[in-house]
Amino acid sequence: MQPALNAFTEQPADTAEATSRAGLEQAFALFNQMSSQLSESYSLLEERVTELKGQLALVSAQRMEELAEKERLANRLQSLLDLLPGGVIVIDAHGVVREANPAALGLLGEPLVGMLWREVIARCFAPREDDGHEISLRDGRRLSIATRSLNGEPGQLILLNDLTDTRRLQEQLARHERLSALGRMVASLAHQIRTPLSAALLYAGHLSEQALPTDQQQRFAGRLKERLHELEHQVRDMLVFARGELPLTDRVAPKALFDSLRAAAEVHVQGLQVRWQCEARGGELLCNRDTLVGTVLNLVENAIQACGPELRLKVHLYARADSLRLSVSDNGPGMDPATLARLGEPFFTTKTTGTGLGLAVVKAVARAHQGQLQLRSRPGRGTCATLILPLIPAAPLSAIQE
């Protein structure tokens, strides 16, 4: 009985051992499987890390190249600003100068960076009556000033351009041109002045006669006055053309200028068909009022002489942007392109009498007002002469301070 009992007892132990071994084998197989998966995942992770490192290195290299290119561009722009002949100033939202190139420092002096712009204006600028669209410094130089907003941030960019040398060269050139024509002018004027002067002397001689009736005295006195006015007109034209400069001391509203012109022209256009039209109301004109009115009267007289009694004349004053335009148009015979091209040259005239200085004087007066004269004409269609003059802002410096 004992051997049989032992056999029965050993059988369950073998079964338990086999079960335990199978569990271990299964666990070991599962461990191997998990290890293999982890190894594969680690390999994939290493590959991904390597790939990301490569991408990061590429992006970093590109970024560094972009930064280097931006730095080179910034250096080029800085060099360009340093070499610009014009001044460049950057002011922030509080009106403080943050940057200024060497040209700006040369124009306005130091200190500049860190100063309030309004303090710089008070220290450096000395506006004059004849500045127009330019502004004078205390040392006499003339600047043009332009402002631009800073895109994307508060503040302003101020551009300064020194026009002193340009204006001086323009004045010298105009002076040389006038001097080169002076000889011809003297000869022409001597001939033109002789006739009214001789007539004036003749009428003065008649007036000295004691027994002359009163009505004849008045007639001779009137003719003497006409000849003297003619002489005065020719001398005035000569002086304006020779000097080429005018003191611009009058600030006149366009409507006031129009009224002055209409009053002065009343005697000249009496009995003629004239249309007066004024469409400019705002702004001011920096000018020499008397000379400017006399210049426009020259244009009116030219139209009257060209058209005769059948004259239909229009005097039109209007504004375009920042300029004032005063046009005198007629229904006369007009001119061909060749004649129109020469019109305004000193001593060129299509009349049998006259010095040929009329339109040359008009051009000189327009230039003295920083404006220009435009002429349009067609044969059989009349002529239109237009003076274009700059309108002056009421307070050019206050806008910059703001």
From Swiss-Prot:
Kindly give the Pfam families that the UniProt entry links to this protein. Answer: HATPase_c (PF02518), HisKA (PF00512), PAS_8 (PF13188)
- The Histidine kinase domain extends over 188-393
Question: Biological process GO terms, please?
Answer: phosphorelay signal transduction system
- Signal peptide (UniProt feature, chain positions): none
Q: Which InterPro entries match?
A: HATPase_C_sf (IPR036890), His_kinase_dom (IPR005467), HisK_dim/P_dom (IPR003661), HisK_dim/P_sf (IPR036097), PAS (IPR000014), PAS-like_dom_sf (IPR035965), Sig_transdc_His_kin-like_C (IPR004358)
| Spans through the membrane | none
Phosphohistidine: residues carrying this PTM: H191
Reported phenotype of the disruption mutant:
Mutant shows severe swimming defect.
Q: Which reaction does it catalyse?
A: ATP + protein L-histidine = ADP + protein N-phospho-L-histidine
Instruction: Report the top EC class in one word.
Output: transferase
Q: What is this protein called?
A: Sensor protein kinase FleS
Q: Which gene encodes it?
A: fleS
